[in-house]
C-alpha cells in the first residue's frame, strides 16, 4: 500500500461553474471577468463555441497571489441576442454540457446552427434536449437515433413553458432556463428530484421549495442580465478522486483547499462518512453565493461497503459513482448500485465500463439495467493488466487511483483522457507520494 500526504491547492477549478460562468457571461450586458477558469478540455470547448458565435472571449494566465498561476477569462457581450450565425458546425468535442446548454441559447437565436462533437458525444442521447425546446416552439432535428448532430433553426419568438423535468438533470434544467430567458413572459421548471443548482444561483433565479420536496424554478424572460465577476472554486468531483486516494492509502492524510461545498455537489461526502470514512470539513465560508471550504481526508481501514439505491442520492452522486464503486470494491470487496440508468448515457456506458474492468481484475460482478453488484474481492492482480478507458475521463481516473493506492500494475488504454476535466491529475498524485 502506498502513503499519500500533503496539502492540495491545485485541484482543477470547478467544471460546472466554469461552463455556466462563460455561458452566462455571453448573455450578460457588459464585461464578465472569470477568475480561476478551468483549463479542462470540456470548458475550453465552451469558450471555442462562444468565439465561433461571435462573442469576444479573452483568456490569460495570471498569478493568483499564492504562488499559483490561474486562468482569467474576460467575456464581452451586448446581451441575449449578441450571437452571430456560425459559418460551420459548432464543435463541442467531448463536452455534453457545452452541447446541451448551448442548444438552449441557440434555439432563441434567429439563425441556423449545428452542434456536433467527437465520436463519444455523437452517441449520447439528445432527445431530452430537443423535447422541451420543441415545446417552446423551436425547430430542432436530430439523427434517426436521437443523437447529434443537433440542427437548430432558431427563432426570437420562443414561447414560455412550464416544464416538469422527467429525470434529474442539471444540464436539461439549465438549457430550459437559458432558453426561457429569451421567451416573452414567465416560465417555470418543476424539479421533483434535486440536481446541481449552479445555474439558478448564478442567474439569481427565484426558487420555491414546496412541502412535498419538489422545487419550482421561476424564469422571467427578456430581462437584461447585468455582467458580474465570477470566481471559480475547486471542483468537488475532482476532489473525490483525491479523497479516494487518501482513504485507500496507508497512513495517508491529505488536505484539499478551497473546494466547492454546494450541497448538490458533495452528497458523496455524506455517503462516505456514513460508511465510516475519515473525512472532515474545515474553514467553511461563502464565495459568490457558493459554500467553499477545506476537506481533510485520512486513511480508513474499516470502510463499510457502499450500497446506493435512493433516487435522490443517486442523482446527487451521479458523476462520482465510478470512483465510489471502484473505491468500495478495492477497500471492501463489495459494492451495490441500483436506480442509476443515467450512468449508461454518460461519456461511456459507465455501468458496463466499471463492471468490465473490475471483472478483468478478477472481481465477481453482476450487472443490471440500472446498476450492478460487486460480490467478491480477489487478491489484487499485481501483474500488469490493461484498463479500457472507453474515452471516458472518470473511468480512467477511477482505476488509476485504485492502482496507485493498491500498488497494482495497471495500464490505462488512454491516460490523456484525464485531461478532459483534470489536466494535472497524474502530476498531483506523484506530488502526494511519500
Swiss-Prot record:
Q: Name the job this protein performs.
A: Catalyzes the transfer of the enolpyruvyl moiety of phosphoenolpyruvate (PEP) to the 5-hydroxyl of shikimate-3-phosphate (S3P) to produce enolpyruvyl shikimate-3-phosphate and inorganic phosphate.
Active site location: 319
Query: Quick one: which residues bind phosphoenolpyruvate?
Result: 15, 96, 124, 171, 350, 394
Which superkingdom, per the lineage? Bacteria
Pathways involved: Metabolic intermediate biosynthesis; chorismate biosynthesis; chorismate from D-erythrose 4-phosphate and phosphoenolpyruvate: step 6/7
The primary location reported for this protein is cytoplasm
Q: Which InterPro entries match?
A: Enolpyruvate_Tfrase_dom (IPR001986), Enolpyruvate_Tfrase_sf (IPR036968), EPSP_synthase (IPR006264), EPSP_synthase_CS (IPR023193), RNA3'P_cycl/enolpyr_Trfase_a/b (IPR013792)
The record's Pfam families line, in alphabetical order, gives: EPSP_synthase
Write the gene name.
aroA
Q: Name its GO BP terms in alphabetical order.
A: amino acid biosynthetic process; aromatic amino acid family biosynthetic process; chorismate biosynthetic process
Instruction: Give the UniProt entry's GO cellular component terms.
Output: cytoplasm
Q: What is this protein called?
A: 3-phosphoshikimate 1-carboxyvinyltransferase
Q: What is catalyzed by this enzyme?
A: 3-phosphoshikimate + phosphoenolpyruvate = 5-O-(1-carboxyvinyl)-3-phosphoshikimate + phosphate
Q: Which family does it belong to?
A: Belongs to the EPSP synthase family.
- UniProt-listed SUPFAM superfamilies: EPT/RTPC-like
HAMAP family found in the cross-reference section? EPSP_synth
Q: Where in the cell is it found?
A: Cytoplasm
- What residues bind 3-phosphoshikimate, as annotated? 15-16, 20, 169, 171, 195, 319, 346
Amino acid at each position: 500500500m502506498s502513503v499519500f500526504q500533503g496539502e492540495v491547492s491545485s485541484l482543477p477549478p470547478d467544471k460546472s461553474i466554469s461552463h455556466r460562468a462563460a455561458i452566462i457571461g455571453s448573455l450578460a450586458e457588459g464585461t464578465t471577468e472569470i477568475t480561476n477558469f478551468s483549463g479542462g478540455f470540456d470548458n475550453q470547448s465552451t469558450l471555442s463555441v462562444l468565439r465561433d458565435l461571435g462573442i469576444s472571449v479573452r483568456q490569460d494566465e495570471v498569478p493568483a497571489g499564492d504562488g499559483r498561476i490561474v486562468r482569467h477569462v474576460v467575456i464581452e457581450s451586448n446581451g441575449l441576442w449578441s450571437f452571430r450565425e456560425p459559418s460551420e458546425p459548432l464543435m463541442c468535442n467531448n463536452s455534453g454540457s457545452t452541447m446541451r446548454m448551448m442548444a438552449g441559447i441557440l434555439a432563441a437565436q434567429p439563425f441556423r446552427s449545428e452542434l456536433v462533437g467527437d465520436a463519444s458525444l455523437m452517441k449520447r442521447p439528445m432527445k431530452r434536449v430537443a423535447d422541451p425546446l420543441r415545446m417552446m416552439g423551436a425547430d430542432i432535428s436530430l439523427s434517426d437515433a436521437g443523437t447529434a448532430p443537433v440542427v437548430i433553426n432558431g427563432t426570437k419568438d420562443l414561447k414560455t413553458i412550464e416544464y416538469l423535468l422527467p429525470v434529474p438533470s442539471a444540464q436539461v434544467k439549465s438549457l430550459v432556463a437559458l432558453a426561457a430567458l429569451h421567451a416573452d413572459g414567465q416560465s417555470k421548471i418543476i424539479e421533483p428530484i434535486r440536481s446541481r443548482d449552479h445555474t439558478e444561483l448564478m442567474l439569481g433565479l427565484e426558487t420555491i421549495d414546496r412541502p412535498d420536496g419538489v422545487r419550482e424554478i421561476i424564469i422571467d424572460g427578456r430581462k437584461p442580465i447585468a455582467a458580474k465577476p465570477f470566481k471559480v472554486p475547486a471542483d468537488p468531483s475532482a476532489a473525490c478522486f483525491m479523497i479516494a486516494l487518501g482513504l485507500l492509502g496507508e497512513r495517508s492524510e491529505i488536505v484539499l483547499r478551497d473546494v466547492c461545498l454546494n450541497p448538490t455537489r458533495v452528497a458523496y461526502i455524506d455517503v462516505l462518512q456514513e460508511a465510516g470514512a475519515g473525512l472532515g470539513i474545515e474553514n467553511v465560508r461563502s464565495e459568490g453565493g457558493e459554500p467553499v471550504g477545506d476537506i481533510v481526508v485520512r486513511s480508513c481501514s474499516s470502510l463499510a461497503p457502499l450500497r446506493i439505491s435512493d433516487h435522490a442520492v443517486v442523482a446527487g452522486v451521479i458523476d462520482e459513482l465510478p470512483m465510489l464503486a471502484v473505491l468500495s470494491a478495492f477497500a471492501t470487496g463489495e459494492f451495490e448500485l441500483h436506480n442509476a440508468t443515467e450512468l449508461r448515457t454518460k461519456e461511456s456506458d459507465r455501468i458496463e465500463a466499471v463492471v468490465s474492468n473490475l471483472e478483468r481484475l478478477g472481481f465477481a460482478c453482476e450487472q443490471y439495467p440500472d446498476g450492478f453488484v460487486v460480490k467478491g474481492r480477489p487478491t489484487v492482480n499485481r501483474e500488469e493488466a490493461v484498463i479500457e478507458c472507453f474515452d471516458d475521463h472518470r473511468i480512467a481516473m477511477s482505476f488509476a487511483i485504485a492502482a496507485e493506492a493498491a500498488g497494482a500494475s495497471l495500464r490505462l488504454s488512454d491516460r490523456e483522457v484525464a485531461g478532459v476535466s483534470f489536466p494535472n491529475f497524474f502530476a498531483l498524485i506523484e506530488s502526494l507520494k511519500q
